[in-house]
Amino acid sequence: INWKGIAAMAKKLL
């Protein structure tokens, strides 16, 4: 899991 991947997922969810 990468921080960039998490940020992108969070932005997509938000």
From Swiss-Prot:
It is found in: Secreted; Target cell membrane. Its main location: secreted. GO terms for cellular component: extracellular region; membrane; other organism cell membrane. Expressed by the venom gland. Disulfide bonds: none annotated. Pfam families: Mastoparan. GO terms for biological process: defense response to bacterium; defense response to fungus; innate immune response; killing of cells of another organism. Keywords: Amidation, Antibiotic, Antimicrobial, Fungicide, G-protein coupled receptor impairing toxin, Immunity, Innate immunity, Mast cell degranulation, Membrane, Secreted, Target cell membrane, Target membrane, Toxin. GO terms for molecular function: toxin activity. InterPro entries: Mastoparan. The modification Leucine amide is found at L14. Antimicrobial peptide with moderate activity on Gram-positive (S.mutans, and S.aureus), and Gram-negative bacteria (S.enterica), as well as on fungi (C.albicans, C.glabrata, and C.neoformans). Also acts as a mast cell degranulating peptide. Its mast cell degranulation activity may be related to the activation of G-protein coupled receptors in mast cells as well as interaction with other proteins located in cell endosomal membranes in the mast cells. Activates G proteins that couple to phospholipase C. Does not cause hemolysis to human erythrocytes. Belongs to the MCD family. Mastoparan subfamily. This is Mastoparan-X. It comes from Vespa xanthoptera (Japanese yellow hornet).
